[in-house]
Amino acid sequence: MRIILKIVFLSLSLVPVRPLADGAPPASPAAALEARFDPAPPAPPLEHGKAFTGDATPVEPGRVEVELAYAPSWWATAGAVDRLSGQQHQVAASVTVGLLPDVDARVVVGWALVHAAPEAPGAPAYGEGLADTTLAARWRFLSLADPGIDLAVSAGVTVPTGRRAAPDRLGTGRDAWNVGGSLLASADLGRFTMGAELGFSAPVGPPTSNDVGLLVCNAALGYQALAWLQPELELNYQHEIELGAQPDERVLWATAALVIPVDAVRLVVGGRFPVWARDAEVGPMATAAAKFAF
């Protein structure tokens, strides 16, 4: 299985101090002292969303978030003579709705294009079409203000709406229903924001492959440098459990990304690269996403 602004800096120029208008009284010493000791402006708000790690902060009731994402990926097997390689380009759209305090729901639909070196003469090397659809819900069961910690659980089902493989084309889905869940955590420490995710998914129904299930472990660390800029790093681990003699597929990625929250819009751009793998077809993956809140 293939594990799938120009930023304008506003500068302030120095301008000469305008003289007081005739008859305007100077500021009193008390007012000057109060202005001098005004508290510093608050730190910028922290954004919990990350590139590849889920967060534990649900959408508020009655609010809606729409996200558009593009995620190309490349992979290759080890070896020189029998090396196999390929790439996938996926576009996804998701809608998340806040249902209740601490509860939201999401639906994700997508389209994918797959190109791979044929595994045998005459085998298909290309495929395109709808991707699988995901329906999920998230419940935050703990929220602390000091220290800032959110804990949540999510559960979801993946519907095999992807185009099935055929003798003349590659498939764009898993050809099986999948159910899964995750434990999510988000935490704040000053301007640092951290996230963690532990999840598992498994196919249900008649078996269509050797896949038993997929374990996911993600950890992320971001720094809110400015109100509109948060660089972040992640470690992403996936372990696909296989049946029979086929070995399990294990991959560890390192991710670098920029999270750019601007009012009701959040942009994410980043990439992840495999740093360790066993028995898996792996390669780099990128993401570019825009989320709009209403």
Segments (PLM) and residue ranges:
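Transmembrane beta-barrel domains of Gram-negative outer membranes and organellar outer membranes
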Residues: 22-292
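Sec-dependent signal peptide recognition
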Residues: 2-10
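N-terminal signal peptide c-region/cleavage motif recognized by signal peptidases
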Residues: 16-17
